[in-house]
Amino acid sequence: MTSAPTSCIRWFRDLSLTDLPLVGGKNASLGEMFQQLTPLGVRIPDGFAVTAEAYRDALDESDAWVQLHRALDGLDKRDIAALARAGAKAREIVYGAPMPKHVETTIREAWREMKARFGEDLSVAVRSSATAEDLPTASFAGQHDTYLNIRGEETLLDAVKRCQASLFTDRAISYRID
């Protein structure tokens, strides 16, 4: 069963390094490995990536960009208390932005496809793969949150939102300011 590409998700089997702007470095690399190594007998886990476009859709539809700029513009990262307040506010804004219905539906359908392929006991990891991660000038390794042993659609949707919000952990904000 092969799903058609959507603007919300991409299957690892359909990704390559050219997709880095769409799904980030980790996901693009997983896709590249899947395509190159699976035919050679190397077992690479299949799964899907939620695209940067899906993230932007959520923030666009909830008009969150203005709130994020208000929370973060002019922030002095040396003021630890201000950084903590701004980070908490930014995470609240992103986590609170409703997931667009088309994104939610697409993620649910992808989850169901994975369950059909891998079984009812399926558990997955939800990891960041920011499009700015692991660039030649910066490595964002360890700056964002990872969620392991995710089971069930509701838990998956929540983990996706929490992972997206983790783009604004205090350490990630501070790192980006540098």
Language model regions located:
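N-terminal beta-alpha lobe that positions the nucleotide/phosphoryl donor
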Residues: M1-D178
